[in-house]
Amino acid sequence: MKISVIPEQVAETLDAENHFIVREVFDVHLSDQGFELSTRSVSPYRKDYISDDDSDEDSACYGAFIDQELVGKIELNSTWNDLASIEHIVVSHTHRGKGVAHSLIEFAKKWALSRQLLGIRLETQTNNVPACNLYAKCGFTLGGIDLFTYKTRPQVSNETAMYWYWFSGAQDDA
């Protein structure tokens, strides 16, 4: 697989694929050990991510290609606290579960380290269990939950924001 920078117009071709079917959600509990997650089955429904058109001058978008076909994209930027931020990660439906997202995340780690950033942050939601499982598998730690991020948006007010972090070996774990 080849990963290279792509213009936003090319990246937008995957926006129609930026959805998934929710079959389970995380219930979040706070314990003495931190956040505990338990999964709960739900009636399947489609979750669509709405693209925000506010482009950040500090961001770069990279595409993952297999046999010259764009199969995934990741948008990265640097943040004020010496972390990279994964703003968007999308994999075409036909290539999900085949290691594309894992490769994009590993690329993001190298990208962050090449810029002397100390780690990576990203946000997802409690209804994106497959993505959360992937982030944990890739060495990310759940660092925060925000119960109110989506409260003002009726179409997503039942979702809870989850903030995941990966720190390079040079940084103490949070």
Curated annotation (Swiss-Prot):
Gene behind the chain: sat-1
Gene Ontology terms, MF aspect: acyltransferase activity, transferring groups other than amino-acyl groups
EC number(s) reported in the record: 2.3.-.-
Any one biological process term the GO annotation gives: response to antibiotic
Catalytic reactions of this protein: streptothricin F + acetyl-CoA = N(beta)-acetylstreptothricin F + CoA + H(+)
Name of this protein: Streptothricin acetyltransferase
Protein family membership: Belongs to the acetyltransferase family. GNAT subfamily.
Signal peptide: none
Protein's job: Involved in resistance to streptothricin, a broad-spectrum antibiotic produced by streptomycetes. Detoxifies streptothricin via acetylation of the beta amino group of the first beta-lysyl moiety of streptothricin.
